[in-house]
Every structure is written in C-alpha cells, then in structure tokens.
Amino acid sequence: MAHLVWMLGENGEEKSFENPNELLPLSRLEEIGVLYWHLDPKKSESEEELTKIRRERGYSYFDLTEICPDKLENYEEKLKSFYCEHIHADEEIRYCLEGSGYFDVRDKDDKWIRIWIKEGDMIILPAGIYHRFIVDSNNYIKLMRLFIGEPVWTAYNRPQEDHPVRQEYVKNVKGDTGFALAAH
C-alpha cells in the first residue's frame, strides 16, 4: 500500500506540487478525523471490502464522476470551485477508481496537509473539515462518490466558524472526545 501525504508550504498554493520534502504517516490524518483505505478496484476481494465498509458506515448511495476536460462540463470553472477552501455538513467519501488527484485538508494548526490519492485509495473527510481538491498533472481522475441516503453536496466556503458542523468538528479534533476511527 503506497500512500503519499505531506505538508504544503506556508502559502499552501502549490497546486501541482508533486515532490514532497517529507512524507507524513497516516496517523497525522487520523488525528484530524480523515480515514484512509487502499482497495484494488481490479480485485474481487476489494469489492467485498468496499461492501463491508458501505454496510458498516451506512453508505446506501453512490455515483461515479470523471474529472477531466473531455468529461466534465465547465471543467475550468468546476476546478476553481473544487479548489476553493470549503466544508460540508456531511462526510465526503471518495474512492479513486482511475487516475489521481490531491485532497488538501487543514490540520489542527490550520496548516495544509496534501493527500495524493491514486487508483485504489479511498478517503473519508469528516463533516466540518476545511478542504479542497485539484487534479494532478495527469489531469484525470475517476471517483466513486458515496453518500448516506440521498446525495447532498453543498459546499460552504470559508469562513464557516459559526456553522454547527464546523463547531462540532473543532470540538472533536481539539477536544478530549476525539474521533472514532476505523480504517486501515
């Protein structure tokens, strides 16, 4: 299982920065409530594992999306929207079936952590975490998006410190309660 997670520079604007100075352990993601799995979309065992994850976490709906100039209408406009720092009121669950891209998430000190997801990587971003997304230099990613119930994809652009979901997230990440984590 290969994962690539690293800190971005002070300004956090390295849209295509692919050469990290120092890789971070997955435990840095767990500290902020981000879950990670690696499944091989070409193996049946991974389908069984995905079914188990969906059942245990209540993900009853999924769809597929391809982010590339030929497949996504208003591609440049959508990329700008994805890259604008935001939160969601629900978890954001993404399973990479093909291609690759970056999810940037804020750590406890409000610094950017970059997660380079590639084929087989599945991540869950907790509700209320500031994040953004951008494709890498391959300019293509095919994702399975999973949801609890009917899909809701409302982005709340930063600042959202008064949003109840953001307040709950901050309480969990900085407080004593922490997150209930179950990934591998």
Swiss-Prot record:
Q: Enumerate the Pfam families for this protein.
A: ARD
Alphabetized, the UniProt keywords read: Amino-acid biosynthesis, Cytoplasm, Dioxygenase, Iron, Metal-binding, Methionine biosynthesis, Nickel, Nucleus, Oxidoreductase
Output this protein's name.
Acireductone dioxygenase 4
> What pathway or pathways are given for this protein in its record?
Amino-acid biosynthesis; L-methionine biosynthesis via salvage pathway; L-methionine from S-methyl-5-thio-alpha-D-ribose 1-phosphate: step 5/6
This protein's encoding gene: ARD4
Q: Which family does it belong to?
A: Belongs to the acireductone dioxygenase (ARD) family.
Q: Name one GO cellular component term.
A: nucleus
| Annotated Ni(2+) binding sites | H86, H88, E92, H131
